[in-house]
Amino acid sequence: MDTSSTFLVLALIKDHQLIGHVQKSCWKHQSEEIFPELTARMDRNGLKPSEIDQVVVSKGPGSYTGVRIAMTIAKVFCAMGNKPIYTVPTLELFAGKAAHVRVLLDARGQRVYTAVYENGQLLGDVSVQSCADIAGECGSENIVGDGHLVNREDVWPDLAQHFLDLEDQWHLEPNVHLVKPVYLKSTTAYLTGIH
């Protein structure tokens, strides 16, 4: 599950196949939509909560509140049901297994979370940069995510499929109670309203 951007993403995977999924834009409404959408997908597949044997959740970076929505639900479900919890970095989820791609996600305040991936592997670092700075670095790179922040087209991949594609890269967390979201802060001071 992922709620780190403008989307609510849920994927039900059984025997390495997607059996139910949703990816819908519902910015600031993910917390209202997640349970009805999850229940609908489970009902369509005849699943009860007790039959879910593990949960995979994106861990950030992304929208501060958004990352916490999916993370909290995943942690509570896994803790109550004594189920394993896996995590995947949000930008890695957006990149999937693309040959070469730069991920851009809105970090607010004219900033962007960004990283470059090659076949599902991170090249360099995940960072927060100003939109103006990163626009010059993008060149002709393939971009997924909030392209409009650098005067490019927004490109939204099939994130449910990416959860499945990245199955070999899910990280099993040893203790559900210690799983924490990843937050990045800009290295440049971000001040407003100071004269």
Each model region followed by its residue ranges:
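Short amphipathic
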Residues: 20-23
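Phosphate-handling active-site elements
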Residues: 45-50, 79-88
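Phosphate/pyrophosphate-binding loops at sites that engage ATP/ADP/AMP, CoA/4′-phosphopantetheine
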Residues: 38-54, 137-141
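DPxDG-like acidic metal-binding loop motif
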Residues: 54-84
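Buried hydrophobic packing segments
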Residues: 38, 73-77, 95
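N-terminal phosphate-binding loop and adjacent alpha-helix
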Residues: 27-43
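Oxyanion-binding and handling regions
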Residues: 1-18, 29-32, 86-195
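Hydrophobic packing within well-folded, soluble alpha/beta domains
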Residues: 10, 34, 52-55, 77
